[in-house]
């Protein structure tokens, strides 16, 4: 036994970098919603960047350590304490047996990540330990952490030095207003000329209907030249669909692999981590970019 769950938080799941290369079989990628923060947590503990971590949403868990361990918290800043002592994000801490870690609410951002010095023992499916709740895949029995349950850990079989860029620009950079870079999607041309301009000049509001699968946003309704009927087509994390009501939907890491709504925009990969940190009432502005510019910006931080 390693860690006892005293309180589970709103939704705390085991995540890694996800199931890469299975979307053609209808299996979402899943993985951490903010992969930059997840990688950073592992790098700060000098672990492999794909090691499973705990992803905490809006409200974090209360965990009792049943053995000495080290841990670090990254991502959204929740009010965090070891016993009665406040601690900081992005700083590794060592705890003793019976110490209690508690995470409360975050004021900006949506998701925090907890990495441990030992490996979380969890179920693997298609080479990933990520929890996919709609099908109860991966993680700990395919479920969020449950009050009274035990998170088991084991010593690392392999140690690893830090891999890649830790994304310093993202540390503590969460806010309530987001500028998100996008590329015109395959069906962007179906929008009226006015809507093609409005989508880049308007500020959208994140609705309460947001999850790892997708985020509905509110604002100016987009309009199409004509009523359209299209076959279901491939979609991906960051695809922005627009249903008949004209209000866009941002697809997340647990989104379906096919969709029948027009794909008007595609978020640039460099801003995928922002999708995972959106919370209700946040403001979003879309910034138009090109495939070439988005690729260059991604290479600059690689």
Summary of predicted features, one role per range:
Residues 1-302:
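Conserved "landmark" site that anchors the functional core of diverse proteins
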């Amino acid at each position: 036994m390693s860690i006892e769950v005293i309180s589970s938080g709103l939704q705390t799941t085991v995540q890694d970098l996800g199931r890469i290369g299975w979307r053609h079989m209808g299996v979402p990628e899943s993985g951490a919603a903010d992969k930059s923060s997840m990688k950073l947590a592992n790098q700060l503990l000098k672990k492999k960047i794909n090691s499973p971590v705990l992803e905490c949403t809006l409200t974090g868990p209360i965990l009792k350590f049943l053995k000495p361990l080290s841990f670090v918290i990254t991502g959204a800043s929740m009010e965090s304490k070891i016993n009665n002592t406040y601690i900081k994000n992005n700083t590794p801490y060592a705890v003793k047996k019976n110490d209690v870690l508690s995470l409360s609410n975050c004021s900006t951002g949506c998701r925090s990540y907890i990495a441990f010095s030992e490996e979380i023992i969890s179920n693997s499916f298609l080479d990933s330990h990520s929890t996919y709740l709609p099908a109860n895949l991966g993680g700990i029995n395919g479920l969020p952490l449950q009050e009274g349950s035990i998170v088991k850990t084991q010593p690392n079989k392999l140690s690893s030095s830090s891999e890649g860029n830790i994304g310093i620009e993202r540390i503590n950079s969460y806010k309530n207003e987001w500028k998100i870079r996008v590329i015109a999607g395959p069906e962007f041309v179906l929008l009226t000329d006015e809507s093609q301009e409005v989508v880049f000049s308007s500020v959208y509001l994140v609705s309460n209907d947001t999850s790892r699968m997708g985020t509905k946003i509110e604002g100016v309704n987009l309009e199409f030249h004509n009523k359209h009927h299209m076959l279901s087509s491939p979609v991906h994390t960051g695809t922005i669909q627009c249903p008949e009501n004209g209000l866009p939907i941002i697809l997340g890491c647990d989104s379906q692999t096919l969709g029948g709504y027009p794909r008007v925009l595609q978020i640039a990969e460099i801003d995928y981590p922002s999708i995972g940190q959106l919370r209700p009432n946040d403001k979003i502005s879309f910034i138009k970019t090109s495939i070439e510019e988005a690729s260059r910006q991604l290479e600059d931080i690689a």
